[in-house]
Design a protein with these regions (language model features):
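Active-site helical microenvironments for divalent-metal-assisted chemistry
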Residues: 1-266
Length: 266
């Protein structure tokens, strides 16, 4: 497999990780390419595309370190092996432990366990599943890699069969977005919710998106006027700050639903 298609990830790795960590990530890419060469995604692209993008999200958008990046690259290798005979699985896990270390192996095995759990569409099940994920994740990095995994899936949801769209969107909305919220990963929470809403309620999503687009310049001007005196004071005090501006479409949708009259009246 031509690994130049993963130059974006490799560049991020070299910018962020130590030389030893970058070398381990390169070895992991080569190892994963060898073991997933015959596997493709629903659109015909190499299966490794998914793992490489999960690793990039973990590195650049979540801030994960070297071992986590290696585990993200290898997670599909271990998941596939776990569905084969025990001898094959044990041979491969021993190999990963020897080449990449015990911590990397532990994370990949935990991710495989989580992927094998089947969730039914109920809020009670979602709460139980959140607790189950935590129980499988003695290493907190496992949860973060899983969030990166789900974010990559949702960003590419159009390549999956249509019958999977609602299930994955429901899971993202009721499970993964809630985990991201509890971990303080609000950008990931909002993006998962927005994509899920686009697939679960496409008409409502488009209506809200159109209204936001119509009023964007007006909203930006208003926010700038409000923030100007605040940012001036912060600058004078030498304080660092971040100006959030993303509108959460799910919150707007929930507000709209709450404002709709109940059929039958009062």
């Amino acid at each position: 497999m031509d690994l130049t298609r993963y130059d974006k990830l490799r560049s991020a790795i070299r910018r962020t990780l130590s030389p030893d960590e970058a070398a381990a990530a390169d070895r992991a890419l080569e190892y994963a390419a060898e073991h997933t060469a015959s596997q493709v995604r629903h659109d015909g692209s190499p299966m490794l595309d998914h793992a490489a993008e999960v690793a990039r999200i973990g590195l650049e958008e979540i801030g994960l370190g070297g071992d986590s990046v290696v585990a993200a690259i290898l997670h599909d290798v271990v998941r596939t092996a776990s569905r084969q005979d025990e001898e094959t699985f044990l041979r491969l896990t021993d190999e990963i432990r020897d080449r990449f270390g015990k911590e990397v192996l532990g994370m990949t095995v935990s991710l495989s366990h989580i992927s094998d759990i089947r969730l039914k569409a109920s809020r009670e099940q979602a709460e139980n599943f959140r607790e189950l994920i935590v129980s499988y994740s003695e290493d907190p990095r496992v949860i973060l890699i899983k969030l990166a995994d789900r974010l990559e899936v949702m960003r590419r949801l159009e390549i999956f069969p249509r019958e999977k769209w609602r299930k994955k969107s429901w899971e993202s909305l009721n499970l993964y977005a809630q985990i991201a919220h509890k971990l303080g990963l609000y950008n990931i929470k909002s993006e998962l919710e927005d994509i899920a809403l686009r697939y679960l309620e496409p008409q409502d999503y488009q209506h809200i998106a159109d209204k936001l687009a119509e009023t964007e310049s007006e909203r930006r001007a208003f926010i700038a006027r409000v923030l100007e005196p605040i940012t001036q004071r912060l600058d004078q005090a030498g304080l660092r700050y971040h100006e959030p501006h993303q509108v959460d479409l799910l919150d707007l949708e929930q507000d709209a639903q709450a404002a709709r009259p109940v059929r039958g009246g009062i």
